[in-house]
């Protein structure tokens, strides 16, 4: 069993019977007292943030995981169907595992699935940057392009994000899936 000194950001551990991913960890040594670790963790089932203090040297259960790339095929109701490129096995992933990033999923996109050693899927990660086509946005005039500002644009996946005034229908843009923000125009 691991101890608190093995904890680091991104580690998945079992806490109070649920799987959590460690978001932040810091060590504190107040005055002449024993040191402790202050941890901020995200529950992988419901997404809630949990904070806890661990004593230095306390035993914790770190979960062994395996990360595998899968190809996104299509949406089936509330589930997303992914295919393993090696075995061609198709998996149905629930909407809760992908979360807000689902709006950036495009057919044939590679998605990282995180499995426990028991074969349970605990996390699905969309690539950090994706390139999508703008399918609908307001036309701009020459005066609008001179001004700085943003306008809403609908992507090919249905996601609506704010883009600069110079972006037109048919443009390909790069988006940060963590924040849902425009990064730059893609070179296509």
Swiss-Prot record:
Identification of the protein by name: Elongation factor P
Pfam families documented for this protein: EFP (PF01132), EFP_N (PF08207), Elong-fact-P_C (PF09285)
Pathway entry: Protein biosynthesis; polypeptide chain elongation
Any one Gene Ontology BP term: peptide biosynthetic process
Subcellular compartments: Cytoplasm
UniProt family annotation: Belongs to the elongation factor P family.
Gene label: efp
GO CC, alphabetical: cytoplasm
Record's keyword annotation contains Translocase: no
Organism: Chloroherpeton thalassium (strain ATCC 35110 / GB-78)
Gene3D superfamilies assigned: 2.30.30.30, Nucleic acid-binding proteins (2.40.50.140)
InterPro entries associated with the record: Elong-fact-P_C, NA-bd_OB-fold, Rib_uL2_dom2, Transl_elong_fac_P/YeiP, Transl_elong_KOW-like, Transl_elong_P/YeiP_cen, Transl_elong_P/YeiP_CS, Transl_elongation_fac_P
Phylogenetic lineage: Bacteria, Pseudomonadati, Chlorobiota, Chlorobiia, Chlorobiales
